[in-house]
């Protein structure tokens, strides 16, 4: 997981509605929860590790604490969710009715996964208010190195 996956949500979380309207009306004093959801085991480990649930059984709905109701929830690697977990996440998002600010990350294009039938279109549009496509870290470092060399020559 690259640094942007961690740093961008940390920047967005404290911003007030009038500073950055698309991130919602939540204050910086609300809870910020990060969950790596790359696999079911990681979801359970993340939620249990944070003390949010005591256990999570397959087939049960994804339940997050009421504290997350008015905070920021970052979901890392949302593109790797199984179909069943996508349905659960969509149901939770529908139930939360916009009280929770959700930031999700994916290492692959979610739109391409929708087109391939691997990701729910409705969940894609529910999550995709603002999309940022960031080059892999290796490409960013390479471009930064080239820019540094060009500046030295001038």
Q: What are the functions of these language-model segments?
A:
Residues 1-14:
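N-terminal pre-Walker A segment at the start of P-loop NTPase domains
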């Amino acid at each position: 997981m690259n640094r942007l996956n961690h740093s961008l949500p940390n920047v967005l979380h404290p911003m007030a509605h009038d500073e950055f309207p698309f991130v919602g009306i939540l204050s910086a004093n609300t809870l910020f929860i990060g969950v790596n959801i790359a696999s079911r085991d990681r979801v359970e480990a993340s939620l249990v590790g944070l003390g949010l649930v005591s256990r999570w059984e397959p087939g049960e709905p994804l339940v997050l604490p009421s504290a997350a109701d008015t905070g920021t929830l970052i979901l890392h690697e949302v593109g790797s969710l199984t179909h069943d977990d996508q349905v659960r996440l969509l149901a939770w998002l529908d139930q939360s009715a916009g009280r929770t600010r959700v930031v999700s990350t994916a290492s692959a294009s979610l739109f391409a996964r929708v087109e391939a039938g691997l990701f729910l279109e409705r969940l894609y549009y529910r999550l995709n208010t603002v999309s940022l496509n960031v080059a892999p870290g290796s490409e960013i470092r390479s471009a930064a190195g080239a820019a540094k060399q060009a500046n030295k020559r001038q």
